[in-house]
Amino acid sequence: MTLNLCVLTPNRTVWNSKVNEIILSTNSGQIGVLPNHASVATAVDIGILKIRLDGQWLTMALMGGFAIIGNNEITVLVNDAEKGSDIDSQEAQQTLEIAEANFRKAEGKRQKIEANLALRRARTRVETINAIS
């Protein structure tokens, strides 16, 4: 038995196909979803989506949103998403270094919040590449 996973951003469909299992980063921690999972709606945190497909694990960086799970259908609506295989490792590392520098020199509450958010996004992209090695 499989699940149908659909990952959507405001601009595109990132994923729409059958999967065996997922592990999703939510605001209250990670949840694993197998076929016949209980229906749930949950907030999605900035984090890694792990997808098991035909015995292999794939990863995707998710940039926050929400997910609806029910009747073996998973719909994930996020601000942005990127497959781990599509992320350029060198570019992601450079972005992380810039985000870390910006976080260190951020002044004022708003600037610190924005720098922290950019840092979390950059870390997630790097971690997505390294998650299933």
UniProtKB/Swiss-Prot annotation:
Pfam families: ATP-synt_DE, ATP-synt_DE_N. Disulfide bonds: none annotated. GO terms for cellular component: chloroplast thylakoid membrane; proton-transporting ATP synthase complex. GO terms for molecular function: ATP binding; proton-transporting ATP synthase activity, rotational mechanism. It is a peripheral membrane protein. It is found in: Plastid, Chloroplast thylakoid membrane. InterPro entries: ATP_synth_F1_dsu/esu, ATP_synth_F1_dsu/esu_N, ATP_synth_F1_esu_C, ATPsynth_dsu/esu_N. Keywords: ATP synthesis, CF(1), Chloroplast, Hydrogen ion transport, Ion transport, Membrane, Plastid, Thylakoid, Transport. NCBIfam families: ATP_synt_epsi (TIGR01216). F-type ATPases have 2 components, CF(1) - the catalytic core - and CF(0) - the membrane proton channel. CF(1) has five subunits: alpha(3), beta(3), gamma(1), delta(1), epsilon(1). CF(0) has three main subunits: a, b and c. Produces ATP from ADP in the presence of a proton gradient across the membrane. Belongs to the ATPase epsilon chain family. This is ATP synthase epsilon chain, chloroplastic.
